[in-house]
A protein has these predicted regions:
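Charged (Asp/Glu and Lys/Arg) segments that form or flank catalytic channels of large polymer-
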Residues: 4-99, 103-110, 184-264
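Conserved aromatic-histidine-acidic binding/catalytic patches
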Residues: 103, 121, 155-166, 231-239
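Residues in well-ordered beta-strands of folded domains
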Residues: 111, 130-134, 151, 218, ...
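E2/UBC-UEV (E2-variant) core
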Residues: 125-186, 259-264
Length: 264
């Protein structure tokens, strides 16, 4: 490797050639971020691992990982969807109109959180937004099951909300391809790929070949703070409206501190 270590910059290349593995490389997408010391932002290339691209790469190049972390078997998929038969979100869901959907639809969940990365425990602590996804039928530890989408320092987000809006718009672009089960003919900015580009040649072909697997966003794994900041949930810190978006309790009609059965 690397001429017995003399050329260390070539070691990764040589290792990949010897193992015949396909490297999973992050893409970049342009987002407006805050520029320190100015009231405006600048556009920067942010590294991102598109869920649909990673989904397809694992299926096509890492079948062992696919069977362990994403989809153990079509029978497991069918068993999962049978267990969701009474779930309200399943009623009139567009995937149920697809042929053999119970054996092709892979349920996924997105996890998001703000993670302290510098000055932990200090008043000047800086955090990072980390988003990842996982299959809901796979097996493994948290480290093995969760696949990174993006990580960004919270200080980069513009106060206007533009950064987050565009970030989620780009992620939705990827999730739509995951749900369609096909590569899009358009990039995340809405521009059509050229017919002679690799992206253009694979446009509207299946992510997972003849098996036709596709991903369905079926779960959100976040704490209440993240649900409020990212998805606009009812603010649990406003006690006049109640502490939880799923519960009708408040201060007056259904007092959240009154535990008598007559009040429930």
């Amino acid at each position: 490797l690397g001429n017995s270590g003399e050329l260390k910059n070539n070691m990764n290349r040589d290792l990949m050639e010897l193992t015949d593995l396909q490297a999973i490389r992050p893409s970049t997408t342009r987002l407006p971020v805050k520029k320190v010391g100015t009231p405006w932002g600048i556009y920067c290339d942010i590294s991102i691992l598109w869920p649909h691209s990673l989904f397809a790469t694992i299926f096509n190049s890492f079948q062992g990982a696919w069977c362990e972390r994403i989809c153990p078997s079509k029978d497991e998929l069918e068993k999962f969807w049978d267990s969701q038969a009474n779930h309200p979100n399943l009623k009139d869901h567009p995937m149920t109109k697809r042929a053999n959907w119970k054996r092709r639809a892979v349920p996924i969940a997105i996890h998001g959180d703000g993670v302290p990365v510098t000055g932990c425990g200090k008043s000047w602590c800086k955090s990072m937004l980390v988003l990842s996804w996982c299959s809901m039928v796979g097996h493994g530890s948290t480290l093995e099951m969760n696949f990174l989408i993006v990580s960004m320092m919270s200080a980069l987000f513009m106060k206007s909300g533009t950064t987050k809006q565009l970030l989620w718009k780009r992620i939705v672009w990827s999730l739509q391809q995951l749900f369609d089960g096909q590569w899009s003919a358009y990039d995340e900015y809405g521009a059509k790929y050229g017919d002679r580009t690799p992206e253009g040649r694979r446009a509207e072909t299946n992510l997972c070949g003849d098996d036709g697997f596709f991903g369905v966003l079926w779960g959100l794994k976040q704490d209440l703070e993240h649900l409020v900041s990212e998805f606009g949930w009812k603010d649990y810190r406003r006690l006049d409206t109640g502490p939880c978006g799923f519960c009708p309790c408040d201060v007056n009609t259904f007092p959240w501190k009154d535990f008598r059965l007559a009040k429930s």
